[in-house]
Amino acid sequence: MYTLVRKTLVALFAVILFAGLCGHAQARNIYSDTADAHKDIQQALELAKREHKRVILDFGGNWCGDCQVLDIYFHQQPNLDLLNKYFVLVHINVGRFDKNTDLAEKYQVPLKKGVPALAVLSASGKLLYSQKNGEFEAMRRMDAASVTQFLNEWKPAKV
Protein backbone atom coordinates (compact mmCIF):
# COMPACT_ATOMS: atom_id res chain seq x y z
CA MET A 1 0.00 0.00 0.00
CA TYR A 2 2.79 2.42 0.96
CA THR A 3 4.53 1.78 -2.38
CA LEU A 4 1.33 2.44 -4.33
CA VAL A 5 0.73 5.75 -2.52
CA ARG A 6 4.36 6.74 -3.03
CA LYS A 7 4.23 5.94 -6.77
CA THR A 8 0.97 7.84 -7.11
CA LEU A 9 2.42 10.89 -5.37
CA VAL A 10 5.56 10.78 -7.52
CA ALA A 11 3.46 10.51 -10.68
CA LEU A 12 1.21 13.36 -9.54
CA PHE A 13 4.23 15.54 -8.76
CA ALA A 14 5.70 14.78 -12.21
CA VAL A 15 2.43 15.77 -13.91
CA ILE A 16 2.25 19.04 -11.95
CA LEU A 17 5.89 19.82 -12.70
CA PHE A 18 5.42 19.04 -16.41
CA ALA A 19 2.29 21.22 -16.58
CA GLY A 20 4.21 24.09 -15.01
CA LEU A 21 7.04 23.75 -17.49
CA CYS A 22 4.62 23.71 -20.40
CA GLY A 23 3.16 27.00 -19.23
CA HIS A 24 6.60 28.61 -19.45
CA ALA A 25 7.07 27.32 -22.99
CA GLN A 26 4.24 29.48 -24.32
CA ALA A 27 5.03 31.99 -27.03
CA ARG A 28 6.19 35.39 -25.86
CA ASN A 29 4.19 38.44 -26.86
CA ILE A 30 6.90 40.06 -28.99
CA TYR A 31 4.71 41.75 -31.59
CA SER A 32 2.15 44.14 -30.11
CA ASP A 33 -1.41 44.11 -31.45
CA THR A 34 -1.92 47.71 -30.35
CA ALA A 35 1.39 49.35 -31.29
CA ASP A 36 1.52 52.04 -33.96
CA ALA A 37 4.36 50.70 -36.10
CA HIS A 38 4.67 53.94 -38.08
CA LYS A 39 5.18 55.88 -34.84
CA ASP A 40 7.53 53.22 -33.45
CA ILE A 41 9.73 53.46 -36.54
CA GLN A 42 9.82 57.26 -36.34
CA GLN A 43 10.82 57.12 -32.66
CA ALA A 44 13.46 54.48 -33.43
CA LEU A 45 14.94 56.66 -36.17
CA GLU A 46 15.13 59.64 -33.80
CA LEU A 47 16.88 57.52 -31.17
CA ALA A 48 19.20 55.99 -33.77
CA LYS A 49 20.18 59.44 -34.98
CA ARG A 50 20.97 60.63 -31.43
CA GLU A 51 22.93 57.49 -30.57
CA HIS A 52 24.57 56.88 -33.99
CA LYS A 53 22.88 53.52 -34.44
CA ARG A 54 20.99 51.70 -37.16
CA VAL A 55 17.40 50.50 -37.02
CA ILE A 56 16.35 46.88 -37.49
CA LEU A 57 12.75 46.32 -38.51
CA ASP A 58 11.60 42.84 -37.48
CA PHE A 59 8.38 41.90 -39.28
CA GLY A 60 6.62 38.93 -37.70
CA GLY A 61 3.81 37.58 -35.56
CA ASN A 62 3.47 36.03 -32.12
CA TRP A 63 2.05 32.87 -33.73
CA CYS A 64 5.30 32.37 -35.69
CA GLY A 65 7.69 29.82 -34.19
CA ASP A 66 10.63 31.08 -36.24
CA CYS A 67 9.96 34.62 -34.97
CA GLN A 68 10.08 33.31 -31.41
CA VAL A 69 13.41 31.60 -32.14
CA LEU A 70 14.85 34.78 -33.65
CA ASP A 71 13.87 36.67 -30.49
CA ILE A 72 15.62 34.04 -28.36
CA TYR A 73 18.75 34.41 -30.49
CA PHE A 74 18.54 38.21 -30.22
CA HIS A 75 18.68 37.82 -26.43
CA GLN A 76 21.71 35.52 -26.41
CA GLN A 77 25.28 36.80 -26.21
CA PRO A 78 27.00 38.27 -28.11
CA ASN A 79 23.85 39.24 -30.01
CA LEU A 80 22.27 41.15 -27.14
CA ASP A 81 25.39 43.30 -26.74
CA LEU A 82 25.57 43.92 -30.50
CA LEU A 83 21.90 44.95 -30.59
CA ASN A 84 22.23 47.27 -27.62
CA LYS A 85 25.42 48.89 -28.90
CA TYR A 86 24.64 49.30 -32.61
CA PHE A 87 20.91 49.00 -33.26
CA VAL A 88 17.42 50.09 -32.32
CA LEU A 89 15.07 47.14 -32.79
CA VAL A 90 11.44 47.61 -33.85
CA HIS A 91 9.09 44.61 -33.82
CA ILE A 92 6.34 45.04 -36.42
CA ASN A 93 3.25 42.85 -36.12
CA VAL A 94 2.06 41.53 -39.47
CA GLY A 95 -0.94 39.77 -37.94
CA ARG A 96 -1.93 36.99 -40.32
CA PHE A 97 -0.20 38.90 -43.12
CA ASP A 98 -2.93 41.55 -42.95
CA LYS A 99 -1.30 44.22 -40.75
CA ASN A 100 1.38 46.78 -41.58
CA THR A 101 1.64 45.51 -45.13
CA ASP A 102 2.19 49.11 -46.25
CA LEU A 103 5.39 49.20 -44.18
CA ALA A 104 6.56 45.89 -45.60
CA GLU A 105 6.01 47.29 -49.07
CA LYS A 106 7.72 50.59 -48.23
CA TYR A 107 10.80 48.78 -46.94
CA GLN A 108 10.72 46.19 -49.73
CA VAL A 109 10.15 43.22 -47.44
CA PRO A 110 8.24 40.49 -49.33
CA LEU A 111 6.09 38.99 -46.58
CA LYS A 112 4.96 36.22 -48.95
CA LYS A 113 8.44 34.72 -48.54
CA GLY A 114 7.70 34.23 -44.84
CA VAL A 115 8.51 35.71 -41.46
CA PRO A 116 10.48 36.73 -39.58
CA ALA A 117 11.58 39.22 -42.19
CA LEU A 118 14.15 41.90 -41.47
CA ALA A 119 15.10 45.28 -42.86
CA VAL A 120 17.97 47.54 -41.77
CA LEU A 121 17.76 51.32 -41.94
CA SER A 122 20.37 54.00 -41.46
CA ALA A 123 19.67 56.60 -38.78
CA SER A 124 18.42 58.90 -41.55
CA GLY A 125 15.88 56.27 -42.65
CA LYS A 126 17.70 55.06 -45.76
CA LEU A 127 17.01 51.41 -46.54
CA LEU A 128 20.32 49.54 -46.30
CA TYR A 129 19.04 45.96 -46.39
CA SER A 130 15.76 44.18 -46.89
CA GLN A 131 15.29 40.47 -46.72
CA LYS A 132 14.36 39.28 -50.20
CA ASN A 133 14.43 35.49 -50.09
CA GLY A 134 13.05 34.52 -46.70
CA GLU A 135 16.56 34.17 -45.28
CA PHE A 136 15.37 34.15 -41.66
CA GLU A 137 12.05 32.38 -42.10
CA ALA A 138 13.70 29.08 -41.18
CA MET A 139 15.25 30.25 -37.89
CA ARG A 140 14.51 26.91 -36.25
CA ARG A 141 17.09 25.34 -38.58
CA MET A 142 19.62 28.12 -37.98
CA ASP A 143 21.70 29.00 -34.95
CA ALA A 144 22.53 32.09 -32.92
CA ALA A 145 25.82 32.45 -34.81
CA SER A 146 23.92 33.25 -38.02
CA VAL A 147 22.26 36.16 -36.21
CA THR A 148 25.65 37.28 -34.90
CA GLN A 149 27.01 37.26 -38.43
CA PHE A 150 24.06 39.33 -39.66
CA LEU A 151 24.43 41.89 -36.87
CA ASN A 152 28.17 42.21 -37.45
CA GLU A 153 27.60 42.67 -41.17
CA TRP A 154 25.07 45.49 -40.69
CA LYS A 155 26.39 47.32 -37.63
CA PRO A 156 27.54 50.86 -38.42
CA ALA A 157 31.18 51.44 -39.24
CA LYS A 158 33.21 53.03 -36.47
CA VAL A 159 33.03 56.79 -36.57
Predicted regions and their residues:
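Bacterial N-terminal signal peptides
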Residues: 11-20
